[in-house]
């Protein structure tokens, strides 16, 4: 049987305060509750927190990418759209931090390969196009649409 800080198996003891019984598992990071959970719930909690870390990284890095995209845009309307999305990121990051807190977890990031790839592609659009050109703006719009589709998914 495996024993670690995120999953404790029945009939095992840990020194972290996550005591177990035959009935089930204590939720990791939630040492103040007397509620017991099933192995599936614990596994889901770990999975869910892992996905939150991924999303948290994506939101934080998207803000940096949007700042670059805004500076690279020629059209004032496009620049304004990037700035608006940039400002919305603060709210989304705060909401994620609230969710981490409700789960008894510290907000942590885990590199999101999908967002990293999309932001790298946006950087390529900037470096591969002429400054102050319609083509660059079109490339930035395309990159932003891809990011938006990822966020929806």
Positions of predicted regions on the chain:
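Amphipathic alpha-helical hairpins
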Residues: 2-153
């Amino acid at each position: 049987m495996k024993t670690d800080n995120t999953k404790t198996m029945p009939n095992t003891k840990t020194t972290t305060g996550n005591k177990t019984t035959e009935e089930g598992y204590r939720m990791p990071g939630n040492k103040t509750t007397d509620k017991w959970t099933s192995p599936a719930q614990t596994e889901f909690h770990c999975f869910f927190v892992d996905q939150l870390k991924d999303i948290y990284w994506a939101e934080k890095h998207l803000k940096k990418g949007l700042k670059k995209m805004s500076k690279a845009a020629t059209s004032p309307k496009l620049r304004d759209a990037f700035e608006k999305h940039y400002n919305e990121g603060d709210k989304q990051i705060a909401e994620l931090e609230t969710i981490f807190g409700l789960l008894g977890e510290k907000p942590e990031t885990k590199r999101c390969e999908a967002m990293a790839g999309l932001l790298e592609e946006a950087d390529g659009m900037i470096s591969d196009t002429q400054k102050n050109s319609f083509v660059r703006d079109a490339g930035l719009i395309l990159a932003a649409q891809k990011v938006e589709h990822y966020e929806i998914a």
